[in-house]
């Protein structure tokens, strides 16, 4: 967590006093995720909007598909978000009004970090060039139907 939050710029030292029996396991507390609901290539414009809602796992120009996890939400619920929408340019003078600050670099996870991150309703895809997280049920309607079928806890 420290390495992720500091974006790789932290030094950490520790000393051990000994070993003790492990107590009760802590419950997992993770915020929700940002889920792409349209397939295509991500755009800087839409990622700027998504960045306001949480931490991104993808950068601009990345191919995404429906149900792919593109970031972590700042709140506890999952949000379906459009990360492929482009900015409509109607007038050249107006296009310079909407210049936003640059994107923060996306968080790149190792296999171990991704395995620790995913929940029961999520999967991890491992390919030679990429590591992708996705929902088990890709479409939003399928996930809503599944939630209705499950008894509330």
Segments (PLM) and residue ranges:
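Accessory interaction regions appended to the cores of large information-processing enzymes
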Residues: 1-153
């Amino acid at each position: 967590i420290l390495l992720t939050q500091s974006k790789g710029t932290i030094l950490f030292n520790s000393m051990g006093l000994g070993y003790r029996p492990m107590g009760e396991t802590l419950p997992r507390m993770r915020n929700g995720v940002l889920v792409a609901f349209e397939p295509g290539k991500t755009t800087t414009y839409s990622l700027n909007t998504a960045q306001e809602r949480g931490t991104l796992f993808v950068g601009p120009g990345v191919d995404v598909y429906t149900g792919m996890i593109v970031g972590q939400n700042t709140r506890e619920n999952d949000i379906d978000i459009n990360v492929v929408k482009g900015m409509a340019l109607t007038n050249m003078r107006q296009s310079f009004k909407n210049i936003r600050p640059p994107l923060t670099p996306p968080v790149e996870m190792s296999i171990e970090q991704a395995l620790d991150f995913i929940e029961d309703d999520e999967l991890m895809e491992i390919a030679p060039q990429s590591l992708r997280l996705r929902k088990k049920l890709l479409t939003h309607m399928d996930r809503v139907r599944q939630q209705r079928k499950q008894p509330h806890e």
